[in-house]
Structure formats: C-alpha cells, structure tokens
C-alpha cells in the first residue's frame, strides 16, 4: 500500500487468503479481518484495493484459496463496506467453476468492478493461457461487461511479454468482430 502510494499506482490487487482442510472458518475470518485492516489503511493512503476472485484447487490439494466461488466472494464484499475495496474479476478463474463467467459476473455486476483480468483456459482446471488457446468466448464476455457500461481497465494475466502482445492482438481482433 505504501509503495503503491509512493509510485502513484492507485490500486493494489489483494487476495482473501487461503485455508487448509481443517481450518476453513478460522482462516476465512482471519482473511476478512486482515482485509478490513488493509482497507482502513489503504483508504487513509488514498489507495484502492482490488479483491481478486481466485481459482479453486483440486479437492485433494492441501491448500485452498478463499473467494473462489460466488458465495465466498459475496461473504467478503458483504462484510467489507469500504468504498475503496473493489473487485478484480479474473475471467479464467470464473470459467472453471459451475456458475461460469456470466454467472459469476451477474452475481456482482459493475458495483465494485474495477479491473478485468484476462487469460484463457478450457474450463476444467486452473490455467492462464494466451487468449485463443482455450475455449473462453471473449466476444460474449466483452459484450456482457461493456454493455453494462464498464469504465475500468482490462489486464492481461498470462505468459511473457511476447505472449501478451499476441494475446492482446487476438483480443483486439475479437473486439473488432463484436
């Protein structure tokens, strides 16, 4: 937060936390309390926090992220009243949960949406592929978000700089076909 203020970054992406198999409720509460403290401090510094919806891990994984599904993410937003805590919508994370991209977006809409993170996958596991290498319908996603009047920014979340350049060009071509 201090570095963001110093370099005038204006926002910091944050995660709700993680849990192990037996400590879900305790970790969920600890994550919320940490985000509240961070929100208070960030507000005083003039920095916005963006809570990212995370990816689910396989059921047999030792560690699981928090804020992976609509219910968990809603818990955090309902209990984080700070106007300076927005949403970083990671589309490829939503693509691997049952409600999908549209269902996850519709649960929250534009109210807190500040950033849309873009990568592709095939909907079956956590991947950050170059757009066009998976099966996300980016035209449908852009139409859904842009038709609502989104005024935030998009961010590429995959690969190296060359991958991002190629992915950006793919997405621009997709936008031209809308």
Regions found by a protein language model. Name each.
Residues 1-33, 43-48, 151-153, 158-161:
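Structural motif corresponding to the early beta-alpha repeats
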Residues 8-10, 36-37, 48, 61, ...:
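Histidine-acidic metal/acid-base catalytic patches
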Residues 16-24, 53-63:
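Active-site-proximal beta-alpha loop/turn segments in soluble metabolic enzymes
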Residues 39-59:
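Catalytic cores of phosphodiester-bond-cleaving enzymes
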């Amino acid at each position: 937060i201090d570095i963001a203020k110093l370099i005038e970054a204006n926002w910091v992406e944050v995660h709700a936390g993680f849990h192990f198999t037996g400590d879900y409720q305790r970790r969920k509460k600890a994550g919320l309390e940490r985000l509240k403290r961070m929100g208070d401090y960030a507000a005083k510094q003039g920095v916005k926090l963006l809570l990212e919806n995370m990816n689910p891990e396989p059921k047999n994984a030792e560690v699981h992220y928090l804020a992976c599904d609509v219910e968990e993410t809603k818990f955090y937003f309902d209990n984080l009243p700070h106007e300076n805590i927005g949403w970083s919508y990671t589309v490829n994370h939503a693509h691997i949960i049952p409600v999908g991209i549209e269902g996850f977006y519709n649960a929250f809409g534009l109210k807190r949406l500040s950033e849309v993170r873009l990568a592709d996958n095939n909907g079956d596991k956590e991947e950050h592929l170059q757009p066009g290498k998976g099966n996300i319908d980016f035209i449908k996603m852009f139409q859904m978000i842009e038709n609502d009047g989104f005024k935030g920014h998009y961010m590429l979340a995959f690969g190296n700089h060359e991958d991002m350049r190629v992915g950006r060009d793919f997405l621009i071509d997709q936008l031209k076909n809308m």
